[in-house]
UniProtKB/Swiss-Prot annotation:
<protein>
    <recommendedName>
        <fullName>tRNA U34 carboxymethyltransferase</fullName>
        <ecNumber>2.5.1.-</ecNumber>
    </recommendedName>
</protein>
<comment type="similarity">
    <text>Belongs to the class I-like SAM-binding methyltransferase superfamily. CmoB family.</text>
</comment>
<feature type="binding site">
    <location>
        <position position="110"/>
    </location>
    <ligand>
        <name>carboxy-S-adenosyl-L-methionine</name>
    </ligand>
</feature>
<feature type="binding site">
    <location>
        <position position="91"/>
    </location>
    <ligand>
        <name>carboxy-S-adenosyl-L-methionine</name>
    </ligand>
</feature>
<dbReference type="GO" id="GO:0002098">
    <property type="term" value="P:tRNA wobble uridine modification"/>
</dbReference>
<feature type="binding site">
    <location>
        <begin position="181"/>
        <end position="182"/>
    </location>
    <ligand>
        <name>carboxy-S-adenosyl-L-methionine</name>
    </ligand>
</feature>
<feature type="binding site">
    <location>
        <begin position="152"/>
        <end position="154"/>
    </location>
    <ligand>
        <name>carboxy-S-adenosyl-L-methionine</name>
    </ligand>
</feature>
<feature type="binding site">
    <location>
        <position position="105"/>
    </location>
    <ligand>
        <name>carboxy-S-adenosyl-L-methionine</name>
    </ligand>
</feature>
<feature type="binding site">
    <location>
        <position position="200"/>
    </location>
    <ligand>
        <name>carboxy-S-adenosyl-L-methionine</name>
    </ligand>
</feature>
<dbReference type="InterPro" id="IPR010017">
    <property type="entry name" value="CmoB"/>
</dbReference>
<comment type="function">
    <text>Catalyzes carboxymethyl transfer from carboxy-S-adenosyl-L-methionine (Cx-SAM) to 5-hydroxyuridine (ho5U) to form 5-carboxymethoxyuridine (cmo5U) at position 34 in tRNAs.</text>
</comment>
<dbReference type="GO" id="GO:0016765">
    <property type="term" value="F:transferase activity, transferring alkyl or aryl (other than methyl) groups"/>
</dbReference>
<comment type="subunit">
    <text>Homotetramer.</text>
</comment>
<feature type="binding site">
    <location>
        <position position="130"/>
    </location>
    <ligand>
        <name>carboxy-S-adenosyl-L-methionine</name>
    </ligand>
</feature>
<keyword id="KW-0808">Transferase</keyword>
<feature type="binding site">
    <location>
        <position position="196"/>
    </location>
    <ligand>
        <name>carboxy-S-adenosyl-L-methionine</name>
    </ligand>
</feature>
<dbReference type="InterPro" id="IPR029063">
    <property type="entry name" value="SAM-dependent_MTases_sf"/>
</dbReference>
Length: 324
């Protein structure tokens, strides 16, 4: 199904990551043995994606792949049809041989908010927790990262990532593993750890922060992005049922409360670097994601509230450091 052999070889040569081989191959074998209704259809399309590196790859200002001579119309239409097999595309956008994959999320907007506050990523090893289809990992490569490892248990996200990476010539600087962070050993191996859009899905947010800290090298940097509410250090929303039609959500702290949480589990130099209300320009339905999206999740008479009456989505970015 999926071949993770190249990643095993890579970490076998890394003294810090090498112990991961004690558990990782069996975990991925178990994942591959689990049934999924759409996987055969997706893999059939993935196999038909043309192999070979695009002549021009821009990961710095966008994710754009092209050749000096554009694909002929028939080839482009065939490629677009294959890529549409992997609907819904939630994270992006991507431009692939003049095919614009207009995803539900403008993940590039989030990246533009995050990037100015990061320690330089050049030559860093990075873990991206809840990485989706790897869009932000590719942008990290654009900033010169040495290695990007993303974890996300979704079959579809992995297929989308492998499709884009195949068109990039199977770049071995980025790897997506279909795992949750709870399945990782305490690696203490990554210079930077990202957790963006994950915390509110965790039943125990403090435990999640500890798991993130356990993946960082001493002095490593955490980039945490999550939904927040307005309020002081004691403000936390715990929806009784749904929030913006999402069921699997638990805790929405204020940014100030989140700073206290990070400090309470041992992070230092914690900074709130950005707070931003999510607009319907950043998250919406498109031809590549035809299901309902943020416009349908807001109160039709008051866009400052969700349809359940909660505050509309607002996201904060915090930067923190693991002690030396």
């Amino acid at each position: 199904m999926f071949n993770f052999a190249n990643f095993y070889k890579l970490i076998a040569q890394d003294t810090i990551l090498q112990p991961w081989l004690n558990t990782l191959p069996q975990q991925l074998t178990d994942w591959q043995n689990a049934e999924h209704g759409d996987i055969e259809r997706w893999l059939k399309a993935l196999k038909k994606i043309p192999e070979g590196c695009a002549e021009n790859i821009d990961l710095k200002t966008s994710v754009t792949l092209s050749n000096n001579s554009p694909l002929i119309d028939g080839e482009r239409k065939k490629l677009e049809s294959l890529l549409r097999t992997f609907h819904p595309w939630r994270k992006g956008p991507f431009t692939v041989h003049d095919i614009h994959i207009d995803t539900e999320w403008r993940s590039d907007w989030k990246w533009d908010r995050v990037l100015p506050h990061l320690s330089p990523l050049k030559n860093r090893s990075i873990l991206d927790v809840g990485c989706g289809n790897g869009y932000h990992m590719l942008r990290m490569l654009g900033e010169g990262a040495r290695l990007c490892v993303g974890i996300d248990p979704s079959h579809l996200f992995l297929v989308q990532f492998e499709a884009i990476r195949k068109l990039m010539g199977n770049d071995q600087r980025a790897h997506l593993l279909p795992l949750g962070i709870e399945q990782l050993p305490e690696l203490n191996a990554f210079d930077t750890v990202f957790s963006m859009g994950v915390l509110y899905h965790r039943r125990s947010p403090l435990d999640h922060l500890i798991l993130l800290k356990n993946q960082l090298v001493a002095g490593g940097e955490l980039v945490l992005e999550t939904l927040v509410i307005d309020g002081d250090e004691n403000a936390v929303l715990m929806p009784v049922d749904r929030y913006a039609q999402m069921r699997n959500v638990y805790f929405f702290p204020s940014a100030k409360a989140l700073k206290v949480w990070l400090e309470s589990v041992g992070f230092i130099d914690v900074k709130i670097v950005d707070e931003c209300v999510t607009t319907t320009g950043e998250q919406r339905s498109t031809e590549w994601m035809k299901h309902n999206s943020l416009p349908e999740y807001l109160d039709p008479t008051d866009s400052s509230k969700t349809i359940e009456g909660h505050p509309a989505p607002k996201r904060a970015i915090l930067i923190a450091r693991k002690p030396d």
